[in-house]
Structures are given as C-alpha cells and as structure tokens.
A protein has these predicted regions:
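Conserved protein kinase catalytic core
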Residues: 15, 43-44, 75, 137, ...
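Short, glycine/charged-enriched secondary-structure capping and boundary segments
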Residues: 19-22, 48-51, 79-82, 143-144, ...
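Active-site neighborhood of divalent metal-dependent phosphoester bond hydrolases
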Residues: 42-123, 154-155
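Short, glycine/acidic-enriched loop or turn micro-motifs at the edges of active sites
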Residues: 11-12, 41, 71-72, 134, ...
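Active-site neighborhood of phospho(di)ester-bond hydrolases with catalytic His/Asp-centered motifs
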Residues: 7-8, 33-37, 64-69, 166-171, ...
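N-terminal active-site segment of His-dependent metallophosphoesterases
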Residues: 1-52
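A general structural motif
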Residues: 1, 28-31, 60-62, 125, ...
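Acidic, His/Gly-enriched loop-helix segments that form or flank divalent-metal centers
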Residues: 89-188, 192-202, 209-214, 219-220
C-alpha cells in the first residue's frame, strides 16, 4: 500500500518544506503527498516552494495541491483591486519579491497556471481534504467555496462525513494543540510554520495517514 502524507500550510518556508519532504518523509515515487494550500506569502521564498513542487512532479512524484485563501487572493488580485490590496497586506508583497516581479501581471505563466490548477477539495476513500474547513450548515458543504478557503470555526456533521476523516489547515495552532489532537475529524495541520518567533508556533507538520503519525520540522528559513 502506498504511503499517504498530508502537509500543512507552508507560507514561503521553502527550506523547511524541502527538509520535511526529502529528509523526514524521504519521499518515494509510490507515495501520495497532499498539500493543504497556502504555499505562498509571509515567508521568504514563495517561489522556492512552488519550484520545488513543480520539480517533484517533473521527476514523477505524486504531489496533489489544494488551494488556500492566499492562492485565491493572488488569483483574484489579477482583476480585483480590493483583493490585490488585501493580498499585499497579508504577505503578497513578500511573494512578489520572491518571484522577482513588482506586479501579479508580470508573474510567469507557469506559476499562474500552477495556482489555477489547485483544487478546492480532494476526496479519497478515507479522506476529505480542504484548506480551511467545511460549512456544515450549508445544504452542500462541498459547494461553499468561501468557507472551504476561509472558515475558522465549524461544528462537525459526522453523518455527512460518513466515516471519512476531514483534514485542514488555515488556522494556525500551537504545537501542543497540533500534537494532542485525536485521530478524528477535524484534524488541523497548520502549526504556524512561518510564525517561528511566536512562542509555541513555527513548525511545519505532515501526517502519515496510514501510520497515524505526525512528522514535524521546525522552521529553518
């Protein structure tokens, strides 16, 4: 059976991400890696994160990418001035610096294509993966894209999940919270990697699904 790993919010921490994948996970061609979004912004090397994912795919590794609210803001900033202002205030300025451009309109097409191909939801036999969570008060939670990208607190509808495990990121939580979570819905994997100077935060987490084990790398960016 192939190994399955789910990785939390990276936010431009490319060195930390590379260490997690190459040294801690020791990625294999048979693995399935799911990333929960927010690859960019705030951290020092958004470009490096995306380049690494593209490189892994080109080498034949199985990397699946969800869309985070930061990728959504980047895409919306192409056409919406308010979204652009919000994105820049929330770390988009560091992303542009990393890509070596002053405007989203100057971003290389391969990066825009990467962001546009990210998925709102990934479902497997055992998992429902989203960036932020699900709004179970909606008649169809999987169609509420706003909530999928932005929701913070949400009660779980176990009947709706029907035995699947809901895993998300988006809302940074301290290490003690992340490692003490029971193996049941919802599991939050956002350890606030980019906030390494904030006590209790600053770790990038991955979940080895079938072994039910967390893997942690402290921010080295």
């Amino acid at each position: 059976m192939p190994r399955v790993f789910i990785i939390g919010d990276i936010h431009g921490c490319s060195k930390t991400f590379r260490k997690l994948v190459l040294e801690k996970i020791s990625i294999r061609k048979s693995d399935k890696i799911y990333c929960l979004g927010d690859y960019i912004d705030r951290g020092p090397d958004s470009k490096g994160v995306i380049d690494f994912i593209i490189e892994l795919r080109e080498k034949g590794f199985n990397i699946h990418t969800l869309r985070g609210n930061h990728e959504q803001l980047l895409l919306e900033s192409e056409i919406d001035e308010h979204a652009k202002e919000l994105w820049l205030k929330n770390g988009g300025d560091k992303a542009l610096l990393s890509f070596g451009v002053s405007s989203i309109h100057d971003l290389d097409k391969k990066y825009l294509d990467f962001f546009k191909r990210t998925k709102y939801i990934i479902q497997t036999k055992h998992l429902i993966l989203v960036h932020a969570g699900l709004n179970f008060s909606n008649a169809d939670p999987l169609k509420d894209k706003e909530a999928i990208l932005w929701i913070r607190n949400f009660p779980i509808d176990s009947n709706y999940l029907n035995g699947k495990l809901l895993i998300h990121g988006h809302t940074p939580k301290p290490r003690d919270f992340i490692i003490s979570q029971p193996f049941q819905s919802p599991i939050n994997l956002d350890g606030g990697c980019v906030f390494k100077h904030k006590e209790g935060y600053g770790s990038l987490f991955a979940l080895n699904f079938f072994e039910k084990k967390l893997i942690e790398v402290k921010n080295i960016d």
